Every structure is written in C-alpha cells, then in structure tokens.
Regions:
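Conserved N-terminal catalytic core of the sugar/cofactor nucleotidyltransferase
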Residues: 1-8, 30, 34-108, 112, ...
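A generic secondary-structure signal marking the coil-to-beta-strand transition
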Residues: 4, 27, 103, 134-136, ...
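A phosphate-binding catalytic loop at a beta-strand-loop-alpha-helix junction
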Residues: 4-20
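Active-site loop signature of alpha/beta-hydrolase-fold enzymes
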Residues: 13-16, 61, 114
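Short Gly/Pro-enriched turn/cap motifs at secondary-structure boundaries
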Residues: 19, 84, 144-145
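Short alpha-helical oligomerization interface
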Residues: 22-26
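Conserved core of the sugar-phosphate nucleotidyltransferase
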Residues: 114-154
Length: 154
C-alpha cells in the first residue's frame, strides 16, 4: 500500500447498542472472542499500514488499556477528543492534526472488517491514485452485509 496511515473512529457513545455499551465502548464489543476494534486493526495490519490513529471520548481508558495490552505491528497513537465529543468530522479533523500524511484510510469499527476486505481496499487505493481523486468511499451492498436484517440508522 502507498497509504501508510489509518484513522479509526472510536469516540462515539454506542447508544444504538445500549445496554451493551453502558459499561464497554462499542469498539470493544466482542464477536467470537475478538473485539470489533481488534478485527479492524488486524485488517489494517494486513495492508502493511505503518501508523494508526484512534480517536477516543466515551470510556476512553478502556480503549487505551486494550491497545496497551496488545502487541500490534503498526504504531498506534490514541487521540483524546477532549472535553466534548467532536462527532465524525471533528474527530477526523482532530486526528489529521496529528499526522503530516495527506493520504489516509479512515475506518469505522462499527463495521465488521474481515481480512478478505483487503482486496477491495487495495483496489480502491489504486483507483484513488490512478484517477488522482481527492477522496473515495468504500460501500458494501446491503444484501452482502452481515446486518442486512437489522433495522436502524446505521
């Protein structure tokens, strides 16, 4: 990969998953004994990305402790959103202030990222650079998603 930096959005309250998220941040919810955050980091690691920034707000100490206990290959920096939640755009802007990179991958750990998504991300990166795009968004057809039977604003 040409892109060496990834941002992971982990600051939200996880209200849609209450009561599960009353005591644990949504990125640390586990499926098959692996948190969705770890699944996301494993995908990023498989892409050979060198540095990851994770923004935090709600139950941020749990995310920091989780990262500190693991031995992930990429350098991981935790960015605190401060006294007020910055929402998606503000969180991204805040994290971008911590890197000199112009090209970054942005991940939402709400999505269950499997390693087999790396093919799509690599193809997306090729298109991004070949067409000299300013940004590009990866979407998955809802019929192919894991949550196609769930209702909600997500």
């Amino acid at each position: 990969m040409k892109i060496n930096t990834a941002l992971i959005l982990c600051a939200g309250f996880g209200k849609r998953l209450n009561p599960l998220t009353l005591d644990i941040p949504k990125p640390l919810i586990e499926l098959n004994n692996v948190s969705v955050l770890e699944t996301c980091i494993n995908l990023i690691e498989s892409l050979d990305v060198k540095e990851i920034f994770i923004n935090t707000f709600y139950l941020k100490d749990q995310i920091r402790n989780f990262i500190n206990k693991k031995n992930f290959k990429p350098k991981i920096s935790i960015i605190d959103d401060g006294k007020n939640i910055l929402d998606t755009g503000g969180g991204i802007k805040n994290m971008l202030n911590h890197t000199k990179e112009d090209d970054v991958l942005i991940f939402n750990p709400d999505t269950i990222w499997k390693k087999n998504y790396s093919k799509e991300i690599i193809e997306m990166e090729k298109l991004y650079f070949s067409k000299q795009l300013k940004n590009i968004l990866l979407l998955v057809n809802k019929d192919l998603s894991f949550d196609k039977n769930l209702n909600g604003n997500f």
